[in-house]
Amino acid sequence: MNFELKNFNTIRINKNQTILIKTTNLENSSKEDTYQFILKMLKAGVHFGHKIKKWNPKMSPFIYQKLQGIHIIDIIQSYTYLKKACKLVYSKSLTDNYNTFLFVGTKKQSPIPNSIFYHASRCNSFYINNKWLSGMLTNWENTTRSINTLKYLKVYQKTNMFSKLSMKTHSIIDKKKNRLEKYFGGIQNMTSLPSTVILVGQHNEITASKECRKLGINNITILDTDCNPEFVDLFIPANDDSSSSLNLILGELQVAINIGRQKFCENLKTWKNSSSILKQI
C-alpha cells in the first residue's frame, strides 16, 4: 500500500481512496519534520484500528473515519500524543533514578512480547512480557522475595555443592529457577518500584494498569480502537497489533529514554567538574 501526503488535510492511499485527517491540534514547530514523521507513521500502519464491530465507544474522539469495515485512527492525534509521551519519558530519564522504566506486554501469539523485550533491552529498562502476576507491584515485598530466590538459585547452580546433588534434585531446582526466570527474569535487577510503566495490549494488562493507578505510578499505554482511555494517565491512540506500528512507537519512547539519560550523564559530568556554590547547598 503506497501512501502520499497531498497536504495536511488528506492522505491519498491509492487512486480511489483518500483518508481525511485533522490538523487543528498540529503544532507549528517544523512542518517538514512533521510531514516526514506522519508519513513514517502511515507507512508503519499506526492509523489502522480494529473492525468496526469491535470498537469501544470511549475511543470515539480518537477515531476519524471508517474505511472498508475498519476504524481509522486520527493520525494527527497519534502523533501529538506520542510526542507528549516522549517528552514525559525524556524528562523522567533526566533524573538520577537510572532504571525506572518498566515495559509490559504479554499478549500471546502477537508481536507484542518480542517488541517489549527488544525495546526495553535497547534502553536498559525492565520488562514483563510473559505474564503479569497479580500483585507484581502492589505486593512488592513478595515480588522482591521471588527475585531474590531467582538470584540465589542462579548462583547456587554454579557451586560445587549443587554439582554433588542428585539428578532428581537438579531437575527440581531447574524447574523452580526456570519458572521464576519466566515471570521475573525481566525485572530481576529492579530494586524498587518503577516511576513509569509503558503498557501494550490493554485487554491483557488490566491488572497491571489498576496496580499502577493504585500506587500512583505513571502509566503510558498504546490504545487501539477497542480500548478504554479512562484506565490510563497518558495514552497513544494507535494500532497495537502490528509489529511495524509497535516498533515505531516503542522505538521512539526508547530513543527518548536514551537521549534523556545521555543528557543526564553529560550534565552530571559538568556538575562534578564544577566549583559552583550550588554544590554546597
UniProtKB/Swiss-Prot annotation:
Q: Per its record, how is this protein called by name?
A: Small ribosomal subunit protein uS2c
Checking InterPro entries in the record gives:
Ribosomal_uS2 (IPR001865), Ribosomal_uS2_bac/mit/plastid (IPR005706), Ribosomal_uS2_CS (IPR018130), Ribosomal_uS2_flav_dom_sf (IPR023591)
SUPFAM superfamilies reported for this sequence: Ribosomal protein S2 (SSF52313)
Q: What are the BP-aspect GO terms?
A: translation
Q: Which domain of life is it from?
A: Eukaryota
| Gene Ontology CC annotations of this record | chloroplast; mitochondrial small ribosomal subunit
The similarity comment for this entry is: Belongs to the universal ribosomal protein uS2 family.
Task: List localization entries.
Answer: Plastid, Chloroplast
